[in-house]
Amino acid sequence: AEADLLVHDLSPDAADLVGLHEDDLAQRHPSLVTVSVTPFGRSGPYSKWCAEDLQLIHGGGWGWMTPGCSDEIDLPPLKPAGQQAGFQIGFAAATIALGALDRSLCTGEGEHLDLAGMAYISSMLEAGFISWSYLNEIPGRAGTRILNPWRIFEVADGRIFIVCVEDDQWARLKEVMGSPEWAQM
């Protein structure tokens, strides 16, 4: 059997037990790209710890920021709907895996990528780092109030979540709303 890419979510001990340690794989299959997706990475003080979506969301800081789409900043830390940590970490794993695979197919050299889920979730804290760097705005529980629509809005029949970060998205949203005068710049 042959493969160019291996992605797994086994704990470091489980991966070693079934022969998927990155050093052994690199020696046997030098062009293979491997991606380990674990809660805390394959090394470090928490590498053997388990975690689920809820722990990753709150450990990564996202839970504290959850009222960011609401005006009710006194709400307790919340969990986003669904399995958001898993979705986001999976998307990151796919992205880095395909990038490394493309490089490997060009060079013939494999590599191992270690994706720590909590570190990735921490990197997503809204636009906090950007807002602090460029606007000198310190993010708080109310989220980062950036210049584009990115929140839950009250509407006539309930609520709607709108994210328009690109000019063409804003243009289409204005069109859907009937091009109100207040939305013209």
Regions found by a protein language model. Name each.
Residues 148-185:
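Aromatic-enriched alpha-helical interface/lid elements that frame and gate functional surfaces
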Residues 39-41, 54, 117-122, 157-159, ...:
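Glycine-rich beta-alpha junction loops
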Residues 1-109, 135:
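N-terminal helix-loop segment corresponding to the beta1-alpha1 unit
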Residues 77-88, 110-112, 140-144, 148-150, ...:
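A short glycine-threonine-serine/GTX helix/turn-capping micro-motif
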Residues 57, 64, 95, 99, ...:
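Generic alpha-helical structural context detector
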Residues 101-140:
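Substrate-binding/catalytic subdomain of NAD(P)-dependent oxidoreductase enzymes
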Residues 66-74, 122, 141-146:
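Short hydrophobic/aromatic-rich motifs at helix boundaries and adjacent loops
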